[in-house]
Each structure stands twice: as structure tokens, then as C-alpha cells.
């Protein structure tokens, strides 16, 4: 018994002597053997769409007359402000905007493009393409451009349509920009592209960017699309990941460049903006309009 008890004491002492090594690591280098189970942060999209220095941001965005794409589709200052805040967050250099009204009786005789300009930060000049009479006023498309750009020429060209349409052509020192909203009917869209082609030789020798809600897609059959004509002279620059919230696989909003100058243009990034960081949080843009904003950042060579 004495031998066994002595043996027991020795084993107990040996066991306790190992506890510092097992529990505390035993030396200063032991931490390398202890797994770090602290969760590591995962990379996430910030949805801020920062623009790189030296690039030009071109955008197209259908306003849906700023009545929102919610269950309550009404003309309110809040809905107009929401639309303008999307533009303010993305801060394009030039933007084509569709579905605008001016002096319409049932819409408080507002000048919608001006209200959007004010909501977007007011550092833009505006051009309204007054195209068709409506409710005592006019409807049409428009273009906003940063006041620092200083265009050399601005003009408008009438387009055919069941509802009259316009091309807004603006020449800047380094490039040309054409904004529009094409008709719903195929023959009118095709005729509009022919008119666009007719205007190209009249523009300064610089890249020509064509942007808007084209009510058309290169994915459609040739007989119901204007794209076979359009792609003779233009190349699509913008993302085509679905520009309609209610039709996820359909893209009808585009930014293109003329083929004669496409080698002078480098695309840095392009997005159909479905989520956007605004006013301290990420928000869904599908409730603002029935179209998503589409932009492309380019660098001119």
C-alpha cells in the first residue's frame, strides 16, 4: 500500500506539472499553436459606385414621371425627390432622362425636369425635349449635364412616333451625347434610327454616345427590332443585366458609342443599378421607377 500510495503521489504531481503547458501555452511562442476562431469580415459590395478620376459617367434613367414604382403610383414631391436622390448619389456627368412633363394640368403644371435637377443637387444644366402635347402641356425626354462641361452646341431633332419623340444632341469639347426615348412601335423605332444615322455626319469629329430608353433589344427578332439598323453604326457599352424591375431578364435602356470612334473610348465600369447606397443605407431602386438607372464610366483616349 505504501508503494502504491507513493506511486500515486508521483503520478499526481506529474499530471499537475503539465497543466501550465496545456492551459497557458507554456512559453511566448505557444500562441501560434492556438487556432483563432474569431470570424473574419467578408468582402461586400458597398453599392456606392465610386467613379475613378479622369473618367466620364454617362447614364440613362426613365423617371416613370416620378410617380414611383410602389403600390401608390402618384405624382408627389417625395417621389420626385427620391428619383433625384438616385441621380445625386450616382452623380453622372451627363444623363438622359425619359418620361418628363411640363405644364400639364393634372400634374400641378410642374416642370418636372427642373424639379429633378433641384433634387439632384442643382449643379446641372437641363435640356427638355418637348415632344408631344399632353393635358394642356408637353411631355418628352431630357438631358442633364454638369455645368462644368460647357457644351459647344445643343439642338433637337423630331422623331416619328405614335407619340411624338425627340433626339437631343449636345456637343461637348471632347465628345457628343444624344439622348432619346424611342417609340413603342417597331416601324417608328426603325425610322428613328435612320434619322439618327442621318445626323451623325453633322456632329463634330469626336465620340458619339447614344443613350436612352430605346423600347427595344438586340435579343428580339430582327423583324420587330431596330437594333439591326442601330448596330450598323453603334456598339453597346452599358451593362445588359435587366433594366426593368418587373421584367428581370429584359434590357431596353442603353448607352452606346459610334463605331467610328469606339477605339477612342475605354470602358472602366458599367452597371444596371439595382441597389444603391443613399442617405446612410443601401436601398432598392426598384421602388423609385419602373426602370433601373443604367450607367457607364468611360475614359477618352
Functional labels for PLM-detected ranges:
Residues 1-10:
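Bacterial N-terminal signal peptides that target proteins for export
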Residues 33-50, 100-175, 269-273:
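Structured beta-strand-rich core segments of catalytic domains in phosphoester-bond hydrolases
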Residues 22-118, 133-134, 290, 299-301:
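N-terminal, active-site-proximal structural segment of metallo-dependent hydrolase catalytic domains
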Residues 55-70, 155, 169, 174-183:
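Active-site-proximal beta-strand elements of phosphoester/diester hydrolases
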Residues 56-63, 83-109, 144, 177-180, ...:
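Active-site beta-strand/loop signature of hydrolases that rely on acidic residues for catalysis
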Residues 65-68, 102-105, 136, 185-187, ...:
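Active-site environment of divalent metal-dependent phosphoester hydrolases
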Residues 27-46, 155, 200-209, 216-301:
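Metal-dependent phosphoester-hydrolase catalytic domains
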Residues 10-20:
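Bacterial N-terminal signal peptides
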Amino acid at each position: 500500500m505504501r508503494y502504491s500510495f507513493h506511486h500515486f503521489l508521483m503520478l499526481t504531481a506529474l499530471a499537475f506539472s503539465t497543466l501550465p503547458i496545456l492551459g497557458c501555452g507554456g512559453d511566448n511562442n505557444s500562441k501560434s499553436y492556438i487556432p483563432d476562431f474569431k470570424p473574419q469580415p467578408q468582402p461586400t459590395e458597398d453599392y456606392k459606385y465610386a467613379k475613378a478620376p479622369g473618367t466620364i459617367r454617362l447614364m440613362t434613367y426613365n423617371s416613370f414621371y416620378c410617380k414611383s414604382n410602389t403600390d401608390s403610383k402618384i405624382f408627389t414631391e417625395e417621389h420626385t425627390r427620391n428619383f433625384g436622390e438616385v441621380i445625386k448619389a450616382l452623380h453622372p456627368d451627363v444623363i438622359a432622362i425619359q418620361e418628363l412633363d411640363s405644364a400639364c394640368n393634372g400634374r400641378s403644371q410642374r416642370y418636372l425636369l427642373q424639379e429633378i435637377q433641384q433634387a439632384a443637387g442643382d449643379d446641372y444644366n437641363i435640356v427638355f425635349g418637348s415632344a408631344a402635347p399632353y393635358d394642356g402641356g408637353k411631355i418628352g425626354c431630357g438631358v442633364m449635364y454638369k455645368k462644368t462641361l460647357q457644351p459647344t452646341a445643343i439642338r433637337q431633332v423630331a422623331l416619328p412616333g405614335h407619340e411624338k419623340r425627340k433626339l437631343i444632341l449636345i456637343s461637348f469639347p471632347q465628345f457628343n451625347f444624344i439622348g432619346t426615348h424611342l417609340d413603342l412601335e417597331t416601324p417608328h423605332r426603325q425610322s428613328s434610327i435612320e434619322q439618327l444615322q442621318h445626323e451623325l455626319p453633322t456632329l463634330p469629329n469626336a465620340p458619339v454616345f447614344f443613350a436612352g430608353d430605346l423600347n427595344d433589344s438586340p435579343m428580339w427578332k430582327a423583324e420587330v427590332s431596330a437594333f439591326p439598323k442601330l448596330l450598323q453604326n453603334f456598339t453597346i457599352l452599358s451593362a445588359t443585366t435587366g433594366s426593368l424591375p418587373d421584367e428581370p431578364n429584359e434590357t431596353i435602356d442603353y448607352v452606346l458609342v459610334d463605331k467610328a470612334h469606339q477605339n477612342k473610348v475605354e470602358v472602366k465600369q458599367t452597371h444596371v443599378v439595382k441597389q444603391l447606397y443613399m442617405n446612410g443605407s443601401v436601398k432598392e431602386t426598384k421602388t423609385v421607377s419602373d426602370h433601373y438607372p443604367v450607367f457607364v464610366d468611360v475614359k477618352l483616349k
